[in-house]
Amino acid sequence: IPSKPFGGADDYTWAPDGRSLVASVKVAGREATWSTNFDLYRIDALGEAAPVNLTAANPAWDAGPVFSPDGSTLFYRAMKRPGFEADRYALMAMDVASGQTREIAPRWDRSPSSLQPSADGSALYVAAQDTGEYPLFRVDVATGDVTKLVADGSVSSFAVAGDTVALARNSIRSGDVIYTGSLQSLGDGANLRQITPTAAERLPDVAFGDFEQFSFKGAGNETVHGYV
């Protein structure tokens, strides 16, 4: 832990009571090289009990565990197709007491790369790819309703504390710029407070070209997006 070669701190999370942690683990074996079957294991903090596989029923990838603030729910991301590492991650909620799981937003076709619960556990804040960008979204845990909070670029990382979010956002014209804002007043990036300068502000003598997004119909009548 973390998993190789691309694992990180989001591969594991501590339970709020500090007595255990949950980690995304792929058990070594003959098929480990091509398998995508990562499971979530509950691990006793004192090592007095054997690890328990919480997601044995899913033969695909389970990742990114995080507890609700009260410890009653374990949120995580899960793929459904074994061996297909480009599968969509679904947002999942597991009742810690019963082990029952459900998909939070089954109608949402985006694949979140990170998630963090709100202070009361009623919502998840996630970053997910969306037509060439990585916006920040709010997902209602009860209804699955999805709201885009920050667009116009890619949110590479974020942290939520109470009503405040701090995030790093980049675009084709600039590397990461740090912003903060209130979660109650965000809307497509409005009301963000810029903390660090953009590339243009750092390099006033450099001309950064403009860009725009375009789309066209591709194979299977699918919409293909690009930049020019």
Spans of model-derived segments:
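Short loop/turn segments that connect beta-strands within beta-propeller blades
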Residues: D44-E48, D95-G99, D140-G144, L183-L186
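Predominantly a core beta-strand signature of beta-propeller blades
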Residues: E48-N53, G99-E103, D145-V146, D188-L192, ...
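Non-catalytic accessory segments flanking enzyme active sites
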Residues: I1-S3, A9-V27, A127, V146-V228
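Short coil/turn segments that connect the beta-strands within blades of beta-propeller domains
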Residues: D17-R19, D70-S72, D120-S122, D163
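A flexible loop/linker signature enriched in serine peptidases of the S9 family
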Residues: I1-G8, S24-Y41, N53-A63, S72, ...
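Short, ordered coil/turn segments that flank beta-strands lining enzyme active or ligand-binding pockets
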Residues: P16, L46-G47, P69, A97, ...
